[in-house]
Amino acid sequence: MDIMLSHFTALEAIRRQETRWILEKDRPARTHIMGNVPAEAPTDGEVAALLARSPLLAGLSRPLETLIPRGAGRRRSRLVKTHVCAQLIPAGSFLELAPGVRCVSPEHLVVQLAPLLSELELIVLLSELLGIYAVMPNVEGGMFQRRRPVTTRELIANHLDALGSFPGVAKVRRAMRHACVGSGSPRETKLSLRLGLNPARGGYGLDVLSMNAPLEVRRIHNMMKKGIRKPDILLRAPSGATRNGRALLGAAVEYDGKDHATEEAHQRDAARHNELTAIGVVEYLVTKAQYRDLAYMDGLVAQIRRDLGTPAKRKTRARARRHRELRQELYAELELIDGLNWNGLERARRRAENNDEAPGNDGWETVPVEAYGLD
């Protein structure tokens, strides 16, 4: 008996440390994997037998969400919940975790979950799958680091093309435009979104060049020795920008969530700061308290703009006030996205009821014209 994990069970399986080597190795190879959705739903007895012999499955939340084809009988019990796959899915839609146990691929998972998530939740999920971390509530820090992302923009885009008009495809395409690549933690993702999203979406509209990408530096204590620094977030400087008479590559923004840094950590921070400065990167550190302080973040971004030579667009008082409200709303909504509880659409529904808005609008489906940079 075969079983295909789907939806939130698949997400949980993809996040497990036991599956990381399957996901991180030969990512393009899985695009050629063919197969069919199991013909029928597993019985409780069959699921119980699988749980008994598979530590991976035994560690997943119940009921297990599984995929079945159209025409197969739906089932929902204490152990299993089925989802109908209404049409054929292309190669690359699943991977094998163990004999008889398959799971939808990261590329297909985001399409499955898209109708169930707000667009901001989908952006955060995509940023995790395109990043080098996995949310794991039962490990220290609530996450673990990956050696490399489990998917890429190209793999997702190719899968969307192969799916055609499959439900969820259009929403994933929209979210992909804003998703982070290379993020090292949920907080880095949220900080990058706040810095990079357009002001009409609650961001500061800065140009995020990269996240955790390697930069070659010279070690200050030994100028003959080369080294690598990987800024959490690197903001692009305009072509030809200079600072203090030197070429400016960009601005690095590092998130430091530690409440009390050690003297050794301070020394590492100082060494990194000096090495980045030497290659034309101005660096800023954002602490947990500063991240939560909207007035501080507004001032920090204003200083970054001055360093980069990219002044903010002039705004009317009304628009400036509205954009500040949106920045506060984005911060608050991101704080509610923990990677485990996906309630964004329900929150949007409640807001719509309170504001007499059209139901089903999470605030991202219809955006002001300035969101497209036309103002």
What is each residue range found by the language model?
Residues 1-168, 312-375:
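Short gly/ser-rich loop at a beta-strand->alpha-helix junction or flexible surface loop bordering the NTP-binding
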